[in-house]
Curated annotation (Swiss-Prot):
Binding site for S-adenosyl-L-methionine: 10, 14, 54, 181
EC identifiers of the protein: 2.1.1.72
Protein family: Belongs to the N(4)/N(6)-methyltransferase family.
Swiss-Prot/TrEMBL catalytic activity: a 2'-deoxyadenosine in DNA + S-adenosyl-L-methionine = an N(6)-methyl-2'-deoxyadenosine in DNA + S-adenosyl-L-homocysteine + H(+)
GO MF terms held by the record: S-adenosyl-L-methionine binding; sequence-specific DNA binding; site-specific DNA-methyltransferase (adenine-specific) activity
Pfam families for this protein: MethyltransfD12
Designated name of the protein: DNA adenine methylase
Gene for this chain: dam
Species annotation: Salmonella typhimurium (strain LT2 / SGSC1412 / ATCC 700720)
Biological processes per GO annotation: DNA replication; DNA restriction-modification system; methylation; mismatch repair
Purpose of the protein: May be involved in methyl-directed DNA mismatch repair, initiation of chromosome replication and gene expression.
The entry's keywords: DNA replication, DNA-binding, Methyltransferase, S-adenosyl-L-methionine, Transferase
Length: 278
């Protein structure tokens, strides 16, 4: 089956892992995603309905606008994908406009421009909540018109919420399946890792996410979580069935060294015996 790409570039996006994720994702009527990101799993599955959430208000506002005002949004966004906008001076002017803009529609248009023209498709904010990704210097950024229309069509069966992972997971019922793609865990308890939003994701929150998954599966609601394969994640997900995906992603650790890390898929499935928590 042909894979559908997201219209946003996204750090840590799950497009390369779709086959593995779908292989282990349980069946159900509704998919709940507390960390929707660019939405690759949503775009490549066939649930009857979707509950999609993220803590990034710009992202959720964008998705609701694409869902409800598709043609208007595509037309307005296309106007920024021109040779004359592909220069640093214009980029920084539009970035400044984004950071002061109060109009949700214009802000959503600028968000797509910044995503495609900014460095590596990063979505990063400073402590004041200002988008601060530098200019990317790409030859000709791609305007994702087909991807926008596909997203909008698929989104007619989705509800988008800007809220915490705990709040969105609380929306799951017996007809739901939950897929969690939290910010990647650090390599160790002392390692630093990138925060893509001003609210960084702590070790306490990583462990709390696993506890919520355990509670949901005890109520017969399956949960699949993806993360780095480390000693920490194996401790957090010790009550799940663990599947290792040989991605061998190279990431920075303390001291500037690079370390190869696989991906871990932790499946909490009702009716599957798991060891007692240590």
């Amino acid at each position: 089956m042909k894979k559908n790409r997201a219209f946003l570039k996204w750090a840590g996006g799950k497009y390369p892992l779709l086959d593995d994720i779908k292989r282990h994702l349980p069946k159900g009527e509704c998919l709940v995603e507390p960390f929707v990101g660019a939405g690759s799993v949503f775009l490549n599955t066939d649930f009857s309905r979707y509950i999609l959430a993220d803590i990034n208000s710009d992202l959720i506002s964008l998705y609701n606008i694409v869902k409800l005002r598709t043609d208007e949004y595509v037309q307005a966004s296309r106007e920024l994908f021109m040779p004359e906008t592909n220069q640093a001076e214009v980029y920084y002017q539009l970035r400044e406009e984004f950071n002061t803009c109060q109009d949700p529609f214009r802000r959503a248009v600028l968000f797509l421009y910044l995503n495609r023209y900014g460095y590596n498709g990063l979505c990063r904010y400073n402590l004041r909540g200002e988008f601060n990704v530098p200019f990317g210097r790409y030859k000709r950024p791609y305007f994702p018109e087909a991807e926008l229309y596909h997203f909008a069509e698929k989104a007619q069966n989705a509800f988008f919420y800007c809220e915490s992972y705990a709040d969105s997971m609380a929306r799951a019922d017996k007809s739901s399946v939950v897929y969690c793609d939290p910010p990647y865990a650090p390599l160790s308890a002392t390692a630093n890792f990138t925060a893509y939003h001003t609210n960084s994701f702590s070790l306490t929150q990583q462990a709390h996410l696993a506890e919520i998954a355990e509670n949901l599966v005890s109520n017969r609601i399956p949960v699949l979580i993806s993360n780095h394969d480390t000693a920490l994640t194996r401790e957090w997900y010790q009550l799940a069935k663990l599947h290792v995906v040989k991605v061998r992603r190279s990431i920075s650790s303390n001291g500037g060294t690079r370390k190869k890390v696989d991906e871990l898929l932790a499946l909490y499935q009702p009716g599957v015996a798991t060891p007692a928590r240590k």
